[in-house]
Structure formats: structure tokens, C-alpha cells
């Protein structure tokens, strides 16, 4: 699936990146001591950011300006792990995020209950890479294009706390930030291997000189997979180059290329998931189900500081995707999906930091625009190859426009009041070119005005209290609107999903303990739920009223120091998520629980670190209570507890070694599940979790 025009782009990008690098690599700067245990050296040392790329410290400072729960996840959280391939691996200890693997690098992602009934791919969370949209223009998306090896940090902006990115979704946004030649100078060579035929390698290089810098990474991965029919291969290029064309101005250009081949084992029944977890769904085997993707992303951001206290930013991105996707819509009804998509996006944002009557004041104003086109064809599928018999042909389009304004005023010393609003409109359209089974053409548009109010109190040194009341509107995606089930026709007439969320919480660091705790209560109208109506078939519907509420709590505590030698320490890192999602006096389902996510999710790691660079410790994942998979609350998953072990050694010469053993007891469990209106014991809704596995890796930075 390596097409000629993409091959030329790939070669040109590689040549451009190579031409930016001198023969001599720079040596990475020494690590800056942290407030807790000494950090690993698998990531670049903290270096000052630039106008287009704030440093990790600057990003953390921005997070502290937000009157809601925002987490900055440093790359060390996942780069010191061998075999970290998915969004789950990147956000494992981020409370409030439910991300569980399905197959390959795909995951089931939900933040505060977003998209819990989206059985395929993603809705309800906006994904950004370097501030530019990864989602398609209609808001849908997936995770295959995200390479954990190429990120410097992940910014987790839950719910309306992604306001300044223009994300009007219940789940908020995830912003994946790549390094630059200034933040990651030098060369990285990395290799990993492990269970189920897993092997991965990476070479990356960063360079900076004068007003110019460049960084690029190439990685390749192959795996056979834990389950039958779950093998995959992926090759990825990511890079950027920056030019400080004035003391107060900078432009950065980004490029990314992905070539991914992935088999899909499919969901199975509960009994099969717990008794024969490695087996694939028989229909997926017969259809030779796969998801093969080739994509190219180009983008640019320019930032100008015309005077102190004013920052003006503008950017644009383009993504081209080619998807070849053999699937099983029903036993004996096998389809081959052939899609070609093109999405463009643009944004403008201005930030004004000024004093009003001697009080600090910040105003942010911005606009976002996105437009996408998808040519979608379907054919009968013969063992993973398209036949000449067409079953669907459409041109689908999506457009979004929105603007936002937010102001934060320090009304009292250490106490700020925040007020803002966003307004926008979305358009969706599908032109059906295959009319022998009826005309499914249609179009719709949805508009919104959403206010937001918040408070932020610096209660003590290193401790903040925050709260906000925010509204959001989430238009349906094209996937929601276009018939996905075999016997369903017509462009759906869905309302936009609306919610109002009240959130309170606290965060901070005092001495050897850091924490983040938040509680939220959301009331939703017209929640969009994709209900399974048959084998691998989904129909999107609006619910009437529903409630999402929960608690997000995380900490990082160094509770012992100088145990056996000066400079060593023992730390404990727990993350707890409580999710209470339910119908609100529904005519059919009363006050039943909404299916799809566990009520309680607890993860923790204990780690001993020696000043020589050696570290090790146990890990645990605990879901103490099974959760429902259907609206009728008749069928459940199963509770489980998993134990693991991690270890590593960071040597002074730039070499790092790391090892991870997962699911040591080889527990059989259900990692995630699709949802249905009413399930039976024979419903194929369950994704088995991975059995016992071991991964190891080496990284050398010079």
C-alpha cells in the first residue's frame, strides 16, 4: 500500500531533514534536578522553549492558569517503558482517562464518559499534534498515527478545559508535542523487543544553530500480536524545522508520514474472551479483516510577539489519508472499505497579558476552521481483497467554524475570575453515488453558543483550588450520520450533543508530594450513542437525558529517602478514576447505568531509584467491579487485578536499558467492550486483554 505519490513525499521529506543536520551531533545538556527523584535520562534535558514551542515548564505554567483539571504528561512516563505503543501506555497514570487496547495500536478512549458508545475509533475527544488537528474535520479520528517514541509531552485538557484549543467536546483534547532541535539536540538510537513477535527501532536527530533548528525521527515496528489475526507493521516519519526570522518572531514547519498494516481480530463473546482469549472472531478471519492506512501530514505555525505581553499565533495543516479496510459487517456479509480523505485546518489566536487597575489580566481570542472531504467506496470483500461488485459510493464533506473569547482577571491577590464564550457552526453533507439501494444523500448543520465561567485560587504556596461551570456542544460525525448497519438506510437526523459541566478541584506540590484531584458533574441532552444492532453493526441515536459524574485523583509521593545510600528514594504513584454515568429518567432505560466503562479504575506504581541510575518497582491495574455492556443492564464484563514489574538503568554515558513484565499472573480479563441496547450471552462485544508478556529495550543518546 506504498503509493508512488506518497513515496515521493516521503523521500523528499527525508532528504530535507537530512540536509538540515550537520555531520557532528551536539551533546545533550545535563539533566536538571527535579523536585522529586532524579529523572531518567531517556528524554532530553529541559531546555528553554521558543515562541512556537513552549518548554515543558512553560506548558506546566499554562496548565496552572486553567480553572480546571489539566495534566502535563512528560515523555519519561512512557519512553522509559519497553513496548509502549498505544495511547493507554502514554496516559496510564492520568486519572480520568479510560484508554484500553483493542487491537494493534487502536484503543477504546473515553474521558469523562466521552464517546463511550462509539464502538469503533474515536469521538468526543479532539486530538492535536503540535497544536494542529489530528482528527478529521467532522471530529472523528483514531490513534494509529500517534507514535509514542516521537513525543516530548502530552497535554491532557479534560472537558471544557480545552477551551483555548477550540475543542467543544465532552472529553476535551489531547495535544501531543514533538521535540525540536533545541529541546532534543543530538542523536537517539533505540531498539526494543518482546513477547508476541514485537520488535521496534528508532533513529532520531536534533540540531540547532543560530536562528535555525531541525528535528526528525524515523521508527519501524512489527508484531505478531497476542491474539490470532492481530499482526501489524508500522513505519513512521515525524519531523519539524524552525526559523527565528526575527527576535520576536518564529515559524515552524511540520511533516509526518505513516504507513500502517494491521490485522483486526475482532470482538468476541464474554465466554470466548475469558476462556479462549487468543482466538479471533471467526467472521474477521473469514473476511481477513484489516485496517491499512497511509497518511501524510503537513503543517506550519507562526508566532509573533509584537510587544511584551502580546502573543499572536497562526497556523494551518493539511492531512491526506488513504484507508484500505476489509471488514465483516455480518457473518457472510464481508465488505472492503476504500476511502481517500483530505482535511485542512487553520487557526488564529491572540493572547494579551495586561494589568487593569493594577490587577493581572489575560485575554485570549481565537478562531478555528476545518474542512474535509472523504471519497468512500465499498465493495464485496474476497479474503481481504475488493471484488468488482460495488456496494456503496459516496462523497462526504464536513466543515467547522468557531470563535472563542476568554478573559481572566485577578480580582483579589491570588484569586482570579475567568469568563468566556465560544460560538460556531458545523456542516455535514453526504452525496450518495450508489443509488440501486436507495438514495442516502443528506446534509445538516448545527450551531452553538457556549459560555464558560471559572475561578482560580492560589490557596497557599504550591497549592491551587479551582472550579468552573462550562457548556459544550458536540455535532455528530459523518460516521454517526451515514448508515453503518446492513439494513439501515437514510442520512440520520441527529441533534447535536449538549452538556453543562460543573467541576471543582485542587492541584499542587508540597515537599515530596504532588497531587491533582477533581470532581465533576455533567448533565447531557441528546447524548449521541452508537448502538450495536447486529454483528459489528452500529446505529447512532440521540438519548434523551443522561448524567456523567466522577472523580479524578492522582498523586506522586516520594515517601522515603536515603534508605540504603544517600540520594536513593522510594516513590508511590497512584491514579484513581471514579465514573458514574447513567440515564436520567429515560422512557426505556429509566436510571440504568450507561455501559462501556468501569465504575472504579485504580492504577499504581511503586518505584525504588538508586543514584547510580538503577530503578525498579511493581505495578498494578485494578478494576474491582464489572461494568455493563448494554443499556438494559443485563450483561457485564468481569472484575480483574493485574500485576507487573518494571526496571531500568540509566548510565552516565547516555545509554539506558529498560524492561517491563506485564500481567505476571497471566490473568484472563476483558480489556474493553462495545455496547448494545440489549445484549445476550452470545453477543460478540468483548475485547480480551493481553496475557503475560515481557518487553525490553536499549536507548543510546549521543
For each predicted feature, which ranges?
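Gram-negative outer-membrane beta-barrel transporters
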Residues: 350, 412, 416-417, 425-426, ...
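N-terminal periplasmic accessory domains that precede
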Residues: 60-63, 87-90, 109-110, 125-129, ...
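Transmembrane beta-barrel wall of Gram-negative outer-membrane proteins
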Residues: 186, 193-222, 227-265, 290-307, ...
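Short acidic/polar hinge/loop motifs at secondary-structure boundaries
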Residues: 132-158
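Face-selective signature of the C-terminal outer-membrane beta-barrel domain
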Residues: 248-258, 292-435, 456-458, 516
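C-terminal beta-signal and adjacent terminal beta-strands/loops
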Residues: 473, 570, 622-627, 649-702
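Membrane-embedded beta-barrel scaffold of Gram-negative outer-membrane proteins
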Residues: 303-305, 311-327, 458, 464-470, ...
Amino acid at each position: 500500500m506504498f503509493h508512488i505519490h506518497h513515496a515521493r513525499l516521503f523521500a523528499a521529506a527525508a532528504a530535507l531533514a537530512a540536509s538540515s543536520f550537520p555531520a557532528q551531533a551536539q551533546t545533550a545538556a545535563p539533566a536538571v534536578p527535579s523536585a522529586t527523584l532524579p529523572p531518567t535520562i531517556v528524554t532530553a534535558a529541559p531546555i528553554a522553549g521558543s515562541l512556537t514551542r513552549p518548554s515543558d515548564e512553560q506548558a506546566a505554567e499554562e496548565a496552572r492558569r486553567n480553572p480546571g483539571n489539566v495534566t502535563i504528561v512528560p515523555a519519561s512516563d512512557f519512553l522509559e517503558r519497553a513496548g509502549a505503543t498505544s495511547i493507554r501506555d502514554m496516559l496510564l497514570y492520568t486519572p480520568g482517562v479510560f484508554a484500553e487496547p483493542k487491537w494493534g495500536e487502536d484503543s477504546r478512549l473515553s474521558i469523562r464518559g466521552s464517546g463511550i458508545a462509539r464502538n469503533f475509533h474515536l469521538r468526543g475527544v479532539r486530538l492535536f499534534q503540535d497544536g494542529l488537528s489530528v482528527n478529521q474535520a467532522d471530529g472523528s479520528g483514531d490513534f494509529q498515527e500517534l507514535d509514542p517514541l516521537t513525543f516530548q509531552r502530552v497535554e491532557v485538557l479534560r472537558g471544557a478545559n480545552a477551551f483555548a484549543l477550540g475543542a467543544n467536546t465532552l472529553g476535551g483534547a489531547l495535544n501531543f508535542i514533538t521535540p525540536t532541535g533545541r529541546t532534543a539536540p543530538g542523536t537517539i538510537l533505540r531498539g526494543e523487543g518482546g513477547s508476541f513477535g514485537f520488535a521496534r527501532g528508532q533513529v532520531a536527530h536534533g540540531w540547532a544553530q543560530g536562528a535555525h533548528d531541525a528535528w526528525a525521527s524515523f521508527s519501524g515496528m512489527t508484531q505478531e500480536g497476542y491474539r490470532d489475526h492481530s499482526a501489524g507493521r508500522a513505519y513512521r516519519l515525524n519531523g519539524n524545522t524552525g526559523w527565528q526570522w526575527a527576535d520576536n518572531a518564529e515559524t515552524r514547519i511540520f511533516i509526518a508520514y505513516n504507513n500502517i498494516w494491521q490485522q483486526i481480530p475482532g470482538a468476541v463473546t464474554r465466554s470466548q474472551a475469558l476462556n479462549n482469549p487468543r482466538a479471533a472472531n471467526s467472521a474477521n478471519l473469514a473476511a481477513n479483516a484489516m485496517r491499512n492506512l497511509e497518511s501524510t501530514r503537513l503543517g506550519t505555525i507562526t508566532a509573533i510577539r509584537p510587544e511584551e505581553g502580546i502573543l499572536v499565533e497562526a497556523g494551518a495543516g493539511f492531512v491526506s489519508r488513504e484507508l484500505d479496510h476489509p471488514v465483516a459487517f455480518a457473518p457472510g456479509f464481508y465488505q472492503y472499505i476504500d476511502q481517500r480523505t483530505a482535511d485542512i485546518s487553520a487557526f488564529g489566536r491572540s493572547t494579551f497579558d495586561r494589568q487593569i487597575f493594577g490587577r493581572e489580566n489575560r485575554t485570549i481570542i481565537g478562531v478555528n476552521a476545518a474542512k474535509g472531504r472523504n471519497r468512500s467506496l465499498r465493495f464485496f470483500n474476497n479474503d481481504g481483497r475488493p471484488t468488482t461488485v460495488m456496494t456503496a459510493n459516496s462523497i462526504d464533506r464536513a466543515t467547522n467554524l468557531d470563535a472563542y473569547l476568554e478573559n481572566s482577571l485577578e480580582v483579589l491577590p491570588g484569586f482570579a475570575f475567568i469568563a468566556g464564550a465560544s460560538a460556531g457552526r458545523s456542516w455535514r453533507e453526504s452525496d450518495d453515488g450508489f443509488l440501486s439501494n436507495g438514495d442516502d444523500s443528506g446534509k445538516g448543520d448545527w450551531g452553538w453558543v457556549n459560555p464558560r465561567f471559572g475561578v482560580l485560587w492560589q490557596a497557599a504556596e504550591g497549592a491551587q483550588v479551582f472550579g468552573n461551570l462550562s457548556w459544550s456542544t458536540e455535532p455528530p460525525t459523518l460516521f454517526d450520520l451515514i448508515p453503518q448497519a446492513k439494513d439501515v438506510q437514510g442520512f440520520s437526523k441527529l441533534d447535536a450533543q449538549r452538556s453543562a459541566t460543573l467541576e471543582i478541584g485542587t492541584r499542587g506540590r508540597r515537599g515530596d508530594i504532588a497531587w491533582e484531584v477533581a470532581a465533576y458533574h455533567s448533565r447531557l441532552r441528546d447524548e449521541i450513542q452508537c448502538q450495536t444492532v447486529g454483528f459489528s453493526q452500529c446505529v447512532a441515536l440521540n438519548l434523551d437525558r443522561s448524567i456523567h459524574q466522577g472523580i479524578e485523583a492522582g498523586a506522586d509521593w516520594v515517601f522515603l529517602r536515603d534508605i540504603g545510600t544517600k540520594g536513593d528514594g522510594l516513590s508511590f504513584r497512584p491514579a484513581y478514576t471514579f465514573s458514574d454515568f447513567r440515564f436520567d429518567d429515560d422512557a426505556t432505560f429509566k436510571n440504568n447505568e450507561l455501559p462501556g466503562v468501569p465504575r472504579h479504575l485504580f492504577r499504581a506504581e511503586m518505584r525504588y531509584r538508586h543514584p547510580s541510575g538503577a530503578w525498579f518497582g511493581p505495578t498494578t491495574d485494578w478494576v474491582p467491579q464489572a461494568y455493563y455492556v448494554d443499556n438494559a443492564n443485563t450483561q457485564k464484563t468481569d472484575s480483574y487485578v493485574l500485576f507487573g514489574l518494571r526496571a531500568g538503568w540509566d548510565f552516565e554515558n547516555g545509554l539506558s536499558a529498560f524492561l517491563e513484565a506485564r500481567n505476571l499472573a497471566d490473568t484472563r480479563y476483558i480489556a474493553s467492550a462495545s455496547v448494545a441496547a440489549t445484549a445476550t450471552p452470545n453477543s460478540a462485544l468483548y475485547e480480551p486483554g493481553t496475557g503475560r508478556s515481557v518487553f525490553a529495550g536499549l536507548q543510546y543518546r549521543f
